[in-house]
Amino acid sequence: MSQAQIDTLTSLFDSAIAVLKNDGELPADWQNNSQITRTKDTSHGDFASNIALTAAKAAKANPRQVAEKIVNALPENQDIRQIEIAGPGFINVFLNTEAKFAVLDDIFNLQNGFGLSKQFDGQKIQVEFVSANPTSSLHVGHGRGAAFGMSVSNLLEAIGYDVTREYYVNDAGRQMDILATSTYLRYLETNGETVTFPVNGYQGDYVSDIAQTLKTQHADTYVHRFADIAENVPEDAQFEINADGEKVLLSGDKEAHIDGLIANSKALLGNGYELFLNAALSSILADIKDDLNDFGVSYECWFSERSIDSEIEPVLQILEDKGYLYEKDGNIWFKSTDFGDEKDRVVRRANGQSTYFASDIAYHKNKFDRGFDKVVNVWGADHHGYVPRVKAALLALGIDADRLDVVLVQFVALWRGDEKVQMSSRSGKFVTLRELRHEVGNDAARFYYVARKPEVHVDFDLELAKSQSKDNLVYYIQYAHARVCRVLEKLETSGLSVDDAIGAAQQELLVAPSEEELIKLLAAYPATLMRSATGYEPHILTNYLKELAALFHGWYDSNRILPVSLTSGETPSADEMAMMQARLRLSKAVRQVISNGLGLLGLSAPSSM
């Protein structure tokens, strides 16, 4: 059943419900939230509806009795061969032969547009994803957010949304100061100063590379003695490794130490401090942009945290005017518990500095001020406690919190054999997204990042992702596409060609159970795409493509598409030619849908493998 036919069937049931309401069998305000689903067993029809079960309570009747009334009220339709009531009250719909093949017509007519919808046409939605601190290269954990966010954005566009992809650049705050100071200390080293590098500094080689560039550009212009920078700074943390291999703090305070170095660096450098901050920021941000672009991830907007500095105080004033702020222990608190949060939150510290949460309130207000109907935040799972406070702030500002959806993406564990690779951006020892892509390829990375529900951890098997076997789902799905391309190449070599008109005229020859299953699964693609998009669940699409590829491979291995006579130099019979064109039509339809689905996930559809 094509999407148009699904819409028609939905309309038929709506008409029947209208009759029941008019006859007083159902309340006039009853809302139809039933589903039309593809049946797994063809003996149960092509599609089934649970509408009678959902209406039974409102109708105050047995579901089977309600089903009988609905069936009797259904308008006639030429595509429907038979309707049966099954089990507790399911309504099974059997299509006639011609209607079953309508999906093939849709696929060939719409091609790349098959499955797309305009249901949400005109609605603006923003998807913010990755938004990693610009303090180091992206690691493999960030890659999952990138693949997920881009796939979700593509899916939302496919159902009609006007999508804005956004990266929130955290270019303000303490982490940037740690980066700037780390860069400055490495700059001193390149100029011959002996530096005791802080435990809490960013220690990767990329910081030294940035510092070397600054030395080339500015020589020793900004050099100060390290002794002056470390003057009166609290002792850094000192650790030892105990008998169990655990790191144990002996003395010192790494946070107080780095804060002291930051303060002294700012005082000694004056305006020059911004040079180091901006140089590090621009270098790392450029690297992030290049990395994501190479990964097939792009954005309409790179939004700077600094750009909303001027919006923080006005938004806090709004909350104060509404009576949602109060002072306690010198801090200014937001009454987030009034809106369901577990505790109130500080928005301005006693020293007068606003908190990161205050900045986030201003940022989210800014999002809705820009006219988005809906906003989707793709966050790491460690941000789960942050969701209630952000929604509380929206409610306090008079913004419908349901317009914000937050998807929490779990972490990625990367395995090399039996060894689990650990990551730490400050130590400089982490596996980057770029390294992963170079090892397994973009397609494998993009697929396995989204192949599971976002709330489920991913154990990324490098060896599996590189293998050429049916166990590697990326290879398995892409190979189905390549197989069809190979068949068409063989056909061309034999001097024959695909005749779509003959294929369409002979498609009723496709009566084998495996062929009927393939056609039914192709018909399910539009609904699958819609469900995957509206639920922000690209794994639904990956599972569909896996099922489609498996059905195709099984059918391909059991049935000849090209007649044996072609390889022996004989002329195929008329019956063989008719079946060949029908099966070529089905094969091309499978290829088209696989290509469409892979494209939405950001994967290639190779013609040979």
Swiss-Prot record:
It holds the Pfam family Arg_tRNA_synt_N. One of its GO terms (biological process) is arginyl-tRNA aminoacylation. Its EC number is 6.1.1.19. CDD domains: ArgRS_core. Keywords: Aminoacyl-tRNA synthetase, ATP-binding, Cytoplasm, Ligase, Nucleotide-binding, Protein biosynthesis. It is found in: Cytoplasm. SMART domains: Arg_tRNA_synt_N (SM01016), DALR_1 (SM00836). It catalyses: tRNA(Arg) + L-arginine + ATP = L-arginyl-tRNA(Arg) + AMP + diphosphate. It is an enzyme of class 6 (ligase). Belongs to the class-I aminoacyl-tRNA synthetase family. Monomer. This is Arginine--tRNA ligase. The lineage of its organism: Bacteria, Pseudomonadati, Pseudomonadota, Gammaproteobacteria, Moraxellales. The gene is argS.
